[in-house]
Amino acid sequence: MIRRYWNINLEEMMEAGVHFGHGTRKWNPRMAPYISAKRKGIHIINLTRTARFLSEACDLVFDAASRGKQFLIVGTKNKAADSVASAAIRARCHYVNKKWLGGMLTNWSTTETRLHKFRDLRAEQKMGRLNHLPKRDSAMLKRQLSHLQTYLGGIKYMTGLPDIVIIVDQQEEYTALRECITLGIPTICLIDTNCDPDLADISIPANDDAIASIRLILTKLVSAICEGRSSYIRNR
């Protein structure tokens, strides 16, 4: 895999607060190699390591996108939800930003059935057929459609398991991460100072609580995906 330049600079990361970890009492000792200092009871993340692993992740997603691979971005906590959706839409990736439904990947046949139901209901609504049903039936199906839109809206065009999964918060999305590990799907994970760096294929040490930090990391990754997609289209 060729290494590329992704314009990752430490000053920009500091401004976004990428270096702020959790309180020193709330940490995982396995994160020690990624911590550079303690300040006012908070662990400070070594941004040189962040830049290195973010660059590696950008190389990986560029390479995958240039070969037409599919991505899923997962981040369901309130602080991450909007950034996840906008980043995914920009790079034409699938995403989950509300709630991870257990078995979404490991029980793919059930997810696929739900997606078919979702697509059918959307088509029925677009053609106005739901409005011609008895009031009670129409209300029930509209509620069902709203529920499916909330939880499956970001993966409505997904036709199979993703090739790479990007996870915004390891602890919050632990179920999703375990499903990827079970299925052997490569993962890229933002890891704060309370996380386990050994669980993902590429772990990017970063503040996973600040919106600016999450947005910066996702922006770099989706820029690399977009470049890779352009390369794929040119070479087809």
UniProtKB/Swiss-Prot annotation:
Compartments in which it is found: Plastid, Chloroplast
Alphabetized InterPro entries for the sequence: Ribosomal_uS2, Ribosomal_uS2_bac/mit/plastid, Ribosomal_uS2_CS, Ribosomal_uS2_flav_dom_sf
Keywords: Chloroplast, Plastid, Ribonucleoprotein, Ribosomal protein
GO terms for biological process, alphabetical: translation
Superkingdom of origin organism: Eukaryota
Keyword Transcription regulation appears in the UniProt entry: no
GO molecular function: structural constituent of ribosome
GO CC terms: chloroplast; mitochondrial small ribosomal subunit
Main location: plastid
Keyword Ribonucleoprotein: yes
Pfam families: Ribosomal_S2
PANTHER family tied to this protein: 30S RIBOSOMAL PROTEIN S2 PROKARYOTIC AND ORGANELLAR, SMALL RIBOSOMAL SUBUNIT PROTEIN US2M
HAMAP family xrefs: Ribosomal_uS2_B
Family: Belongs to the universal ribosomal protein uS2 family.
Name of the featured protein: Small ribosomal subunit protein uS2c
Organism: Ranunculus macranthus
Name of the gene: rps2
